[in-house]
From Swiss-Prot:
The lineage of its organism: Bacteria, Pseudomonadati, Thermodesulfobacteriota, Desulfovibrionia, Desulfovibrionales. One of its GO terms (molecular function) is structural constituent of ribosome. InterPro entries: Ribosomal_bL34 (IPR000271), Ribosomal_bL34_CS (IPR020939). The gene is rpmH. Pfam families: Ribosomal_L34. It comes from Nitratidesulfovibrio vulgaris (strain ATCC 29579 / DSM 644 / CCUG 34227 / NCIMB 8303 / VKM B-1760 / Hildenborough). This is Large ribosomal subunit protein bL34.
């Protein structure tokens, strides 16, 4: 049986990367919340 998680660096960066987050208002909100929380990594 094929597993559900098939890692791909390109797919990860395109959907969850910093530039992808900054492209939408909701994404910018995620970055803002992660900064406020003090996350070392803001995006994938």
């Amino acid at each position: 049986m094929k597993r559900t998680y098939q890692p791909s660096k390109i797919r990860r960066k395109r959907s969850l990367g910093f530039r992808a987050r900054m492209a939408t208002a909701a994404g910018r909100e995620i970055i803002r919340r992660r900064r406020a929380k003090g996350r070392k990594k803001l995006a994938a």
